[in-house]
Design a protein with these regions (language model features):
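Conserved structural core of kinase catalytic domains
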Residues: 55-59, 64-109
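Catalytic-loop of the protein kinase fold
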Residues: 119-134
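C-lobe/activation-segment region of protein kinase-like
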Residues: 136-218
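Core catalytic subdomain of AMP-forming adenylate-forming
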Residues: 226-248, 282
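C-terminal boundary motif of the adenylate-forming
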Residues: 238-257, 263-267
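Conserved C-terminal "lid"/linker of ANL adenylate-forming enzymes
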Residues: 249-254, 263, 277-348
């Protein structure tokens, strides 16, 4: 599929930062002159020098993968790639952990998508994550995030193994959200992990974890601690002693390679530096001053909303705003000023 010159050369207008980690920054927006074409930029020009080789290695894999799947229904469209980063179409849809499809039609379409990718010689290699699967507004399947994708020149054993693992990971999603739809054949496939996958878990994954979590201070945020219960009372007492602070709400979020961080939303007109000076040791990792906390009818803070902001869960927030549109005026300023821009997820 060829991109028209007026689209490929159009100026990117940023709107929302979705994620920022050591390897890239993900920003959604639009193209100037094309308001009906939402796009997303994986921005690479701000990556620190020591992470640049890996960041561009991942970017080149994504570029090759996106070029190979052009024209496949459910795959993003690569618009351009340059020293700034790579720009692709924004795929409208709901992440699988929210959509939780129970209809056989979605899984049938997801298999169709993997089959067409396989014909193009592409394996995704990262669809174990439910957030990389989408249910589009018309109920179709879509995939995003091709950073780990492989484009295979031949259909040898490695290709067949990786394609099988893609399918097996789709079946794991099916087992999570629609277990009654699994066939006996699919259940047998789920019970047998390929030998290369077992070798990866035993050898390469520990090395990968050491590099990313220890050397590069980056992780998937595994493990939780109840820091709110342990440190919250002293923090709340110290902050609430100030006459310009009217309330404090505490949430947790996943720290890179360090467990769990404490995120404090403080209802005040003080600046963040002033709040940090008031906090006892150990202080919360993030302190966000807010003009007004979102509240329930009884006046208590909406901790469900604040937890989604603290963990940068924009998809869930968008779904919440659709079901509760009156929340918009209260939480949009908080979302715009949020301090955690990673996509790590707390796991108990």
């Amino acid at each position: 599929m060829t991109i028209a010159p007026d689209i490929s050369n159009a100026t990117f207008v940023p709107e929302t930062v979705h994620k920022r980690d050591i390897f890239s920054e993900t920003i959604s927006g639009r193209l100037d002159g094309h308001p009906d074409m939402p796009v997303v930029l994986r921005k690479l020009d701000g990556v620190p020098p020591y992470a640049r080789p890996i960041a561009w290695y991942l970017a080149r894999k994504e570029i090759r993968g996106l070029r190979a799947v052009q024209g496949i229904e459910g795959c993003p469209l690569l618009i351009r790639a340059n020293k700034v980063g790579l720009l692709r179409s924004w795929t409208k849809g709901t992440p699988l952990q929210l959509a939780k499809p129970s209809d056989a039609a979605w899984y049938k379409d997801a298999k169709r998508l993997l089959r067409e990718m396989r014909r193009a010689g592409v394996t995704h290699n990262d669809i174990a994550k439910p957030q990389n699967w989408l249910m589009t507004p018309d109920g179709r399947a879509a995939v995003i995030d091709f950073q780990l994708a492989s484009v295979h020149r031949t259909r040898g054993r490695l290709f067949r193994t990786m394609a099988r693992e893609d399918l097996r990971h789709l079946l794991k999603q099916k087992r999570a959200y629609a277990p009654d739809l699994l066939t006996p054949c699919e259940q047998r496939m789920l019970s047998r992990k390929a030998l290369p996958a077992r070798l990866w878990m035993a050898t390469a994954k520990p090395a990968y974890n050491f590099i990313t979590r220890r050397l590069m201070n980056w992780s998937d945020g595994e493990g939780t601690e109840d820091r709110v219960e342990r440190e919250g009372p002293a923090l709340r007492t110290a902050l609430m002693a100030h006459p310009q602070i009217t309330d404090v709400a505490l949430c947790t979020y996943a720290l890179a390679a360090k467990g769990v961080g404490l995120y404090a939303f403080v209802e005040t007109d003080l600046l963040a530096d002033d709040l940090r000076a008031l906090a006892p040791n150990p202080p919360p990792e993030l302190i966000q001053p807010v003009a007004q906390l979102p509240r329930r009818a009884d006046g208590t803070p909406r901790l469900d909303v604040l937890q989604l902001i603290a963990t940068n869960r924009l998809d869930e927030l968008a779904a919440m705003l659709e079901s509760e549109p009156t929340l918009g005026d209260q939480i949009k300023p908080l979302i715009a000023a949020r301090l955690n821009l990673t996509d790590r997820m707390l796991r108990s």
